[in-house]
Design a protein with these regions (language model features):
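Short, small-residue-biased leader/transition segments that mark boundaries at the very start
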Residues: 2-6
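Dynamic helix-loop-helix/coil hinge segments at AAA+ ATPase domain boundaries and subdomain interfaces
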Residues: 95-115
């Protein structure tokens, strides 16, 4: 699937050739001026004088694409590029448009315990073995706030948070299948 391509950052040769051709075509299109278009179309300029002039830019589209692909493991693609917190509705991932803005620097107490979770998260992001984590304690001790703050803190490094309700636990295997090929790293928060 598409996620595999993003994760591997390689394409089969036939698709790579098609991609190169499309990027070259789009590169030409980006540099096309209205005057060049009118000349090629052999249309008298006065007939299309109402068309606005547009500016072109010196953009190296293949290089921009390669740069974006090199960052996909941190920035994501599609909805994962725009959002970093998700919930599950009817078996589908849905972005949380206004996630809790909690920051680690705003959380008092439990630094020692929180540091263990942060170290585990760093291991996950580095592609090293990471553990499942169970946070427990009295209500109001910052368990949920810590998870949300970690998600906010590490979103620029490719971390995404998926909030799963208790009555949705049966959907976790399907979620894992959907997320497995994604180059980002995910915390499932129950």
């Amino acid at each position: 699937g598409l996620g595999d391509v993003y994760r591997r950052q390689t394409l089969p040769p036939v698709l790579q050739t098609a991609l190169d051709n499309e990027l070259a075509f789009l590169q030409q299109l980006c540099s096309l001026t209205l005057d060049a278009l009118l000349d090629a179309a052999e249309v008298p300029a006065e007939e299309l004088a109402f068309l606005p002039r547009w500016e072109t830019a010196d953009l190296d589209l293949p290089a921009a694409y390669a740069q974006r692909m090199s960052e996909v493991g941190k920035k994501g693609y599609g909805m994962f590029a725009k959002h970093h917190v998700f919930t599950v509705e009817n078996g589908k991932l849905v972005p949380v448009k206004y996630p809790d803005p909690q920051r680690l620097s705003e959380l008092p107490g439990y630094e020692k315990e929180r540091e263990k979770v942060i170290a585990n998260t760093r291991a996950l992001l580095a592609g090293m073995p990471a553990n499942n984590v169970l946070l427990y304690g009295d209500a109001g001790t910052g368990k949920s706030s810590s998870v949300k703050a970690i998600a906010n803190e590490f979103a620029p490094e490719g971390l995404r948070l998926v909030e799963v309700k208790k009555n949705q636990l049966y959907q976790i295997p399907d979620l894992m299948d959907k997320l497995a090929a994604n180059p980002l790293k995910f915390i499932l928060f129950i």
